[in-house]
């Protein structure tokens, strides 16, 4: 039985190695940076919480497309290797790139399950 959800904590540990990383809203105006949103929900059995499952969106913002892509690829690599195993199971479910007002954004979406 799981007592505490740690998906956001682990994601922050992995992504903050590559870029300033924030939950929901950036606390900076300097590029590059990334923000994430997460909607963890417990999945119950008769014994209590079996696991948590979250839809997670990570968006990298930068004025330089190549740098945004490099940061995004590093985050993808770390999430897929660092959040798959006994404690977590992750899969990437989306990847989009956009440019608005000369700022590039690359959004990656994941489904992440936490088992321990």
Cite the ranges covered by each PLM segment.
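Glycine-rich loops and low-complexity Gly/Arg-rich segments
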Residues: 46-48, 59-63, 81-86, 116
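Small/polar-rich, solvent-exposed N-terminal microdomains that initiate assembly or binding
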Residues: 1-48, 66, 73-77, 82, ...
């Amino acid at each position: 039985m799981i007592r505490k959800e740690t998906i956001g904590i682990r994601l922050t540990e992995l992504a903050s190695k590559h870029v300033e990383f924030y939950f929901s809203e950036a606390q900076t105006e300097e590029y590059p940076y990334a923000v994430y949103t997460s909607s963890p929900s417990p999945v119950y059995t008769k014994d209590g919480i079996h696991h948590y499952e979250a839809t997670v969106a990570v968006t990298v913002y930068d004025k330089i497309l190549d740098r945004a892509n490099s940061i995004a690829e590093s985050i993808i690599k770390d999430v897929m290797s660092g959040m798959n195993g006994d404690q977590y199971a992750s899969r990437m479910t989306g990847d989009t790139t956009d440019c608005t007002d000369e700022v590039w954004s690359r959004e990656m979406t994941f489904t992440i399950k936490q088992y321990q």
